């Protein structure tokens, strides 16, 4: 049975996470991978060029050495392994999977707070505290997204939890009760 790309990326991420744990440099590997992801996000054609058969092998190797720069040996080896296996196209997904594993192990949760108006940092910090107390998260990284269609209130959403306190949902529930 063929595996999907996310499963394959997860295997690479799990392997480098375990290796980093054994070498006691998980935080350093995380920093290196995030730096690489930033470079890839800012240079959309990087992987295409670094994988192209039209580009000389030495030039592709130089590109990858530039990408990994001062990274740990395990990160350099990961990128080289992906290149050898013709899987450079999943490097960003591998980074995302590594970050997910790191966050899970460290009790870190990424939360999207959807509100009708932008919130200041103080209110976002309070929402993060509420979310942490309700879910048991050690740390909450909160991002505010403005969506005027929710009318008011807030929707807090992580990968596994949804807390919908939006005015739009409350109105819809009242309407259903009145009509039901």
Swiss-Prot record:
Membrane topology, as annotated: Peripheral membrane protein
GO MF annotations in UniProt: proton-transporting ATP synthase activity, rotational mechanism
Keywords: ATP synthesis, Cell membrane, CF(1), Hydrogen ion transport, Ion transport, Membrane, Transport
GO cellular component, one term: proton-transporting ATP synthase complex
Subcellular location: Cell membrane
Domain of life: Bacteria
Membrane-spanning parts: none
Coiled coil, from the record: none
Subunit annotation: F-type ATPases have 2 components, F(1) - the catalytic core - and F(0) - the membrane proton channel. F(1) has five subunits: alpha(3), beta(3), gamma(1), delta(1), epsilon(1). F(0) has three main subunits: a(1), b(2) and c(10-14). The alpha and beta chains form an alternating ring which encloses part of the gamma chain. F(1) is attached to F(0) by a central stalk formed by the gamma and epsilon chains, while a peripheral stalk is formed by the delta and b chains.
Annotated HAMAP family: ATP_synth_delta_bact (MF_01416)
Function: F(1)F(0) ATP synthase produces ATP from ADP in the presence of a proton or sodium gradient. F-type ATPases consist of two structural domains, F(1) containing the extramembraneous catalytic core and F(0) containing the membrane proton channel, linked together by a central stalk and a peripheral stalk. During catalysis, ATP synthesis in the catalytic domain of F(1) is coupled via a rotary mechanism of the central stalk subunits to proton translocation. This protein is part of the stalk that links CF(0) to CF(1). It either transmits conformational changes from CF(0) to CF(1) or is implicated in proton conduction.
Stated family: Belongs to the ATPase delta chain family.
UniProt protein name: ATP synthase subunit delta
């Amino acid at each position: 049975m063929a595996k999907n790309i996310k499963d394959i990326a997860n295997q690479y991420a799990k392997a480098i996470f375990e290796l980093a744990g054994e070498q006691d440099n998980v935080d350093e590997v995380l920093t290196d991978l995030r730096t690489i992801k930033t470079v890839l996000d800012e240079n959309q054609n990087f992987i295409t060029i670094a994988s192209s058969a039209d580009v000389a092998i030495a030039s592709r190797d130089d590109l990858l050495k530039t990408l990994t720069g001062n990274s740990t040996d395990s990160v350099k080896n990961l990128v080289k392994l992906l290149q050898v296996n013709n899987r450079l196209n999943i490097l960003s997904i591998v980074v995302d999977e590594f970050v997910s594993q790191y966050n899970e192990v460290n009790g870190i949760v990424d939360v999207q707070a959807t509100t009708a108006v932008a919130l200041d940092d103080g209110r976002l910090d309070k929402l993060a505290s509420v979310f942490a107390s309700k879910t048991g998260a050690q740390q909450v990284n909160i991002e505010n997204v403005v969506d005027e269609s929710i009318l008011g209130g807030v929707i807090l959403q992580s990968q596994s939890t949804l807390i919908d306190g939006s005015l739009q949902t409350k109105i819809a529930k009242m309407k259903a009760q009145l009509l039901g």
